[in-house]
Each structure stands twice: as structure tokens, then as C-alpha cells.
């Protein structure tokens, strides 16, 4: 029988629990999907470069990355990016483009239903 491995990062465990609760409370399946993606092992979690965010978004979009945002590439327009983690370079480049780098918890507070959010993985 395979041993079930759970996340040991207390911030991640708490975030997954919050996402499941918000999904149930707000009837928003997006949060349950993000919780499932974050529960994966680190090597299978999303790592998205800024160049991909730039390519698939337009001015004013809200993007959610269930993993880490990396600083490769450049961002040419304002976007709000929510992720579990950011590299220092990515944070700097997002702010220089006039956008925002926020946590997933903050996105849940701003948009409990999860509407008009693009998931990038």
C-alpha cells in the first residue's frame, strides 16, 4: 500500500484548507481546483515565466498561478498576478510594468467567487 505524502509547509497546508472552505462557502469550483493543484508534489507544481503571462494576457487581466512565478522574460502591460510564490526578479518586473504581485489569500479576499481569473500552469 502506497504511503500518502502530505505537504510539510505549514503555509501551504493552511492555504489548501482555506481554498477548500472558500470553494464550499462561495460555490466557486475554481478554489477547489487550485487546492488540488497546490496539493501536488513541488516538482509537479506550476512554474510560470513572465514571458508566458505577457503572451496570454492583456491589460487589466487577473492571473492565478498555482505555484511559482519566475522572472524570465518581460511584462509589457499591467496585470494582477496572484501566486503561491514569486522570485525576486518576477516581483520587481511586475511592479515596474505597473502591475501587482499578490498572494492567493489576497485574491480570495478581493474576488471570493473567482470570476474573471485566468489560471496559468
UniProtKB/Swiss-Prot annotation:
GO molecular function: RNA binding; structural constituent of ribosome
Ribosomal protein recorded as keyword: yes
Listed GO CC annotations: cytosolic large ribosomal subunit
One Pfam family, short name: Ribosomal_L18
Keywords of the record: Ribonucleoprotein, Ribosomal protein
InterPro entries reported in the protein's UniProt record: Ribosomal_eL18 (IPR000039), Ribosomal_eL18/eL18-A/B/_CS (IPR021132), Ribosomal_eL18_arc (IPR022947), Ribosomal_uL15/eL18 (IPR021131), Ribosomal_uL15/eL18_sf (IPR036227), Ribosomal_uL15_CS (IPR001196)
GO BP term, example: translation
NCBIfam families attached to this UniProt entry: PRK04005.1
Membership in a protein family: Belongs to the eukaryotic ribosomal protein eL18 family.
Name used for this protein in its record: Large ribosomal subunit protein eL18
Protein species of origin: Methanocaldococcus jannaschii (strain ATCC 43067 / DSM 2661 / JAL-1 / JCM 10045 / NBRC 100440) (Methanococcus jannaschii)
Lineage: Archaea, Methanobacteriati, Methanobacteriota, Methanomada group, Methanococci
Gene: rpl18e
